[in-house]
Amino acid sequence: MAYEFSLPNKTIMGENALEASGETLKSFGEKAFIVSGKVVTKMGTVKILTDYLTELDIKFEIFNDITGEPTDTMIEAGVKAYKDAGCDFCIAIGGGSPLDSGKAIAAMTELEGNICDYMGTSIEGKFPKLVLIPTTAGTGSEATKFSIITDTKNNVKILLKGEALLPDLAIIDYKFSMTSPKSVTAATGMDALTHAVEAYASKKANPLTDTYALSAIKRVFKYLPIAYKDGENKKAREEMALAAYEAGVCINNSSVTLVHGMSRPIGALFHVAHGISNAMLIKECLSYVIDGSYEKFANIARVINEDNDNLSDKEASEEFINELDKICNICEIPTLKEYGINKDEFYKLMDKMAEDAMNSGSPSNTIKNISKQDLINIYEKLWK
């Protein structure tokens, strides 16, 4: 069976990747619209970018009003600021939220209506050139055709997609992630792991995504614990930056499954960081679907630890679940209760969350057929 495989138009990766991108940046126009958040700006990361743009004689306008959960109203404000400033192209720098926002803003400078109008459709068009610079290692947004924005009217996260949302240039330099605090390192690292595992166990998986996925999984299990414990470890940061990109490439081509489908409603309704809500769910979700393909989950276990080579597929799959539990403990992933979520409120909204998850389409991509009741059962298990 034939399959498609898409990547960002151009990727510059490694130490001093920003400085290696000068000619490409100059070719995009005379004035850049920088999309970021206040934390990244305060940490001085945006200044590194603006100093380099100044060296290149590229003017810029900074829009740093993006928060951890970007909304449709933020996108509207960004589009207005872009047009008012007369910019030529867009650079988004930060974690997944600024990067997702940069995609949406660039698209909406040319599209009509509200960003929420495009949920469930394939976004197409010729938009301003888009540059994505991740400062965390995990979301993989720099390699995907997806953007997640909160619809404030309906209080739901919407998934936007389309080849036109892929960046024209992705700049990946581990140095930008060196200042990430432990909590962000854990959340984004677990997000990368979730991407890779879901892509590998997806109905849309293909030989190329399988290769990227297993490589990313191996890197995360080896280097995330190191990066979490020692944020100044350059080797761990560099390997996690690569793992995040690999995992992003995976979901760009074979998509996510029930973990992400169930995670988005938790983030939208209880304001849990995306990577953390994924990590809260991943063990229970995969335990629920593991019998959909013992062979695939066994392959993951054997990539993580060669000692699993002598186990049966079923035994190796179960060992993979144990390894998930271990890495979640190492990264101190909280439970819903520890995060401060009210159980009664959660149960009251459980049916809506399951409905929203099913409507996202992600659960239907799972290697095992999943129903709304299955999702409710998994949500309940998070409290046991």
Residue ranges and their predicted role:
Residues M1-F89, L336:
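ATP/NTP phosphate-donor binding region
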Residues N9, E15-N16, S36-K38, I66, ...:
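Fold-independent oxyanion-binding glycine-rich loops
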Residues F146-S254, T366, Q373:
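Carboxylate- and glycine-rich phosphate/diphosphate-binding segment that chelates Mg2+/Mn2+
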Residues A199-K326:
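Active-site segments that bind and position negatively charged phosphate/pyrophosphate groups
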